[in-house]
Amino acid sequence: MAKTNLSVDAADLTSRITRTPFPGSRKIYIEGSRPDIRVPFREVTLTDTLVAEGSETRREANPPLRLFDSSGVYTDPAASIDITRGLSPLRGAWINERQDTEALPGISSAYGRERLNDPALSALRMAHAPVPRRAKAGANVSQMHYARQGIITPEMEYIAIRENLVRAQLAERLATERVPKTGHSFGASIPKDITAEFVRDEVARGRAVIPNNINHPETEPMIIGRNFLIKVNANIGNSAVTSSIEEEVDKLAWSIRWGADTVMDLSTGENIHETREWILRNSPVPIGTVPIYQALEKVNGKAEDLTWEIFRDTLIEQAEQGVDYFTIHAGVRLAYVPLTANRLTGIVSRGGSIMAKWCLSHHKESFLYEHFEEICEIMKAYDVCFSLGDGLRPGSIADANDEAQFAELHTLGELTQIAWKHDVQVMIEGPGHVPLQLVKENVEKQLEACFEAPFYTLGPLITDISPGYDHISSAMGAANIGWYGTAMLCYVTPKEHLGLPNRDDVKQGLIAYKIAAHAGDLAKGYPGAQMWDNAVSKARFEFRWEDQFRLAIDPDTAMAYHDETLPKENAKVAHFCSMCGPKFCSMKISQEVREFARLNPSTTTLAKAPGVIPIQQVSSGFEEKAEEFRKGGNEIYS
């Protein structure tokens, strides 16, 4: 087992993190109703379109494109970042203004105090960890509670601005661009304009969640719900084999650079508590965990030795650090375990298998299920969101949509109602491995059983033959399930089922899933989603190569692939690429056809659409070619 050095190399950590903006992009901020609501976007600068008019060429300006940006200050060159101190508490003033929380005199968790008082760990700890806060006696500090009181919080206004994708930009572009394709939302209620009131209403109904622990004020508020943009989660975390705090913080920054909307810390190695603190203090996105993993470490990996008291202490420990959502497998009940006996791959969820083993060892109902109301009391005191785990999810397409999976799903619906009674936010985790023809049924059953609580799925993988390429097979399932109504997709990397992902694997998984999420947004008709596609297509047709690179979901790779065969700078203004060459480029030929039609007008056309070749011109062209053929001796091959 690899041992962690009992220190953190701050210089190494700072040097690891990629800070440069994307090519041709800059960070901009849109201000809300108050100066401290500053919503980030990535603005892509575009070059002019060159329009030939006879012997003259005029320029048409292309307005910049603004994109959703979850990368935080890490892509803002103007920001000052000190990893050892963490990010600025963006939401600190908002939390204090509500006057319903209080600073604690110390850490409540027994394990947290034990770690704090261990002098051997002093070099691992963050020197500037904040004092934890908790709801005042009798108070509920969840965003759902505020929403149900009719209160629009600054977080809700922030989210509305963010989700709107700068609608003014949409109106300007629609005046000059093609009308977006009509989507099919399968019953979702996506408005043309996202308002703060709409955000409040969706959270109050339980159809959306805002994961924002009061002890994680560094977060830039975001929302998860099927009436909003589809979000993507990335998993990071140490293991018994690798356990560097520096590596995990770097993976966090790397993940959000490539579009992770939330990050789960699934650490199972050493110094989980300290690793999580560094991640939280430097994360502008919500952080989720699976608390049972750390609880298991506290009993030396013996599931049968777990107790409610140990688990409860772990929840409080992590809530006071600032974890925004907990995956809790409370739906794995004793009676459901035998339902997995005839499965091809049994129980594949780590959390699910831990709880199944505990239930069988004691022949008792799960302590997570039995103590669920007490868990709700903890969650609402810190505003931690439930991510109710699918511990009985299928681990192969042979086991998809079986009795065990759906029995647990109905229990998750029951638990959702209990959580909502406490005004605690809930999302529901889903599979897994599901063949394409069964994907839609998963969403339909989840919406019904769990009362439209947001669905959060791992993939699903739609085939089991793709080790090494599971990010591709699962992204296919993810695009479909996102279209049908899933609110957040948990990424899969090329290393799924094979090993712990490295930095490049994280990027590959995120790119695949950001494409899947965007495809889902297009399919369900999310307003403004198609602007990005139109901008890429226009740049491609006009041979604005630099703009194509800038607008690509992965600019670095797009440019690198182009330059492999056409590396010279003049190739970036050429009207062809290496695929077809200069004589067979369809877009170049299409432009020539348009220009030919413009210079040879006729009153008789095949259609009235702009750019269609006049019919007389087509006929004369046919005659010319026929005459050439006759003069050539009527030979097909010469």
From Swiss-Prot:
Residues at which [4Fe-4S] cluster binds: C577, C580, C585
InterPro entries: ThiC, ThiC-associated_dom, ThiC/Bza_core_dom, ThiC/BzaA/B
Residues annotated for substrate binding in this entry: N235, M264, Y293, H329, S349, R350, G351, D390, G391, L392, R393, E429, Y456
Catalyzed reactions: 5-amino-1-(5-phospho-beta-D-ribosyl)imidazole + S-adenosyl-L-methionine = 4-amino-2-methyl-5-(phosphooxymethyl)pyrimidine + CO + 5'-deoxyadenosine + formate + L-methionine + 3 H(+)
Cofactor binding comment, as recorded: Binds 1 [4Fe-4S] cluster per subunit. The cluster is coordinated with 3 cysteines and an exchangeable S-adenosyl-L-methionine.
Enzymatic class: lyase
BP-aspect Gene Ontology terms: thiamine biosynthetic process; thiamine diphosphate biosynthetic process
Record GO cellular component, one term: cytosol
Cofactor: [4Fe-4S] cluster
Keywords: 4Fe-4S, Iron, Iron-sulfur, Lyase, Metal-binding, S-adenosyl-L-methionine, Thiamine biosynthesis, Zinc
Subunit comment: Homodimer.
Protein name: Phosphomethylpyrimidine synthase
The organism of origin for this protein: Polaromonas naphthalenivorans (strain CJ2)
Lineage of the species this protein comes from: Bacteria, Pseudomonadati, Pseudomonadota, Betaproteobacteria, Burkholderiales
